[in-house]
Structure formats: C-alpha cells, structure tokens
Amino acid sequence: MYIVGIDIAKKSHQAAIMKPDGTLVGRSFRFTNTKQGFEFLMDKLAAVDSSLENFEFGMEATGHYWLNLYTWLADNHATVHVINPLQSDALRNLYIRKTKTDSVDAKIIAQVIRIGQYSETKLADDRMLMMRDLCRQRFFLVDMVANLKRKIIVMMDRIFPEYQGFFSDTFGKSSTAILKHCTTPEEITLFGEDNLAQLLQVASNGKFGLKKAQELISLARNSFAARLSSKTLSLLVKQMMEQMELLQNQIGILEKHISSHFKSFGT
C-alpha cells in the first residue's frame, strides 16, 4: 500500500508518494487545483501502480481548498484521510529544524498517515455541505439587500425627505410599487392621482387607493427636497429597487431549497 501525502494550497498542491517502509517513490511533485491537475495526479499514480485501491491519501483540512480534491478522490472510491493540521505540527517542527523545502509538508503528511498517530477530521456529508453552502449564500444575499436598503434611504432623504414614514414600511409592497415608478416629488406629481391610485390599489390588495394617492401628491407638492442631482439619484434608486427585487426572488428560491434539504434530515 502506497501513501500519498498532499500539501494543500489555493492554486496548486504538492504531493509525495511514500512506501510502507517510509521511503519515497521518486521526487515530490506539484499539480494544479483543477480537473487537469487531478488527471495529472492520476497519471503520476498510474505510473507507480495501475490500481487506485493500492493508494491511501492524506491531506490536512486547510481552509476549504481541500474540498474539491477530496470529493474527486472520494468519487473515484479512493481511501482519503483528512487530518487536523495541529496533529502534524510536532513532526513538522522536527523536519523544519533539518531542512525547509516546498516538499517537506507533503512528506510529513504521508509520514503521519504511515505512522497512524492521528485522528481524522469529521467530514460533513453531501447534505450538510449543501446546506452550508445554501445558507452562506442566503446570508450573503440578505446582507446585499440590507446594504441596498440603507443606500436607498440615504438617497430618498435627499430627493424626497418626507417620503420615509409615509408608509409603515418603506420597502413594503405599496411603497415598493411607487419607488419602482417614481421617486422624486416632481415625478410623483406628474404621475397623477389616477395612476397612483391604481398602482396603490393593486399593490395593497385594495387597502389603499385614491385617498392615499392624494395624500402622497400633497406631500410631494410641499416637499423640502434638495434639487441637486435629483434625476441622477432617482435613476439610481429605481435601479437599486430592481436589484433588490431580483435578490429577494433569489433569496426565496434559496429558502425553498434550504427547507427541502432540511426535511431530508428527518427532523
């Protein structure tokens, strides 16, 4: 049984092939963290032994860069040991006192696997990894929406300061429908009572109508808005409203997937 120690990095990995007695098979070699790099690794191993079953792989859980290589090896039914980096520190220090080359870590990892003095890092299964990635993406998108809302509020304070507070929720359905069409006092006034009333009635499911439209136009006519760059800011607000709508739709899709995957855990 051969042992392949792999020193994980972001763009490329270093590998060393070791025999059971601790001697190395040839020199250590580098391969890229790509499909082509994986194929290069397989070719290198095939030159030593044609069966992947005769190799055991060892790697440290370094960030997330090991995941791609790990999953490709696992899909090929290889035996892979993922160890905590702290477990190889003592042996690493002994080697570093003697020499320091790019291949040292790969040899150390192979040696740790050969000696067997390690405990494997508990790996998440496909469902857990999927759930983690889905939740991370959701948090990322939610943060983007929050940032857009803050920017919109700042811009609206300049072009229509009285608008905030007119609706109980500036980003509720009724207010969103308005801001997608008109944002400045001038635009709202020109849009007209009838158009505003119709827009509000549809967006609010009949809760608002002509009365609310008239109140908004009155607010617009008496606004103490900054007139500098109002057209530019209006354009930016409308674009950000569109971006926010897209992000919220994407969040909804993610939440459906998260709910579906959560049910698969049987909880």
PLM-predicted stretches and their roles:
Residues 1-267:
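A detector of single, family-specific signature residues
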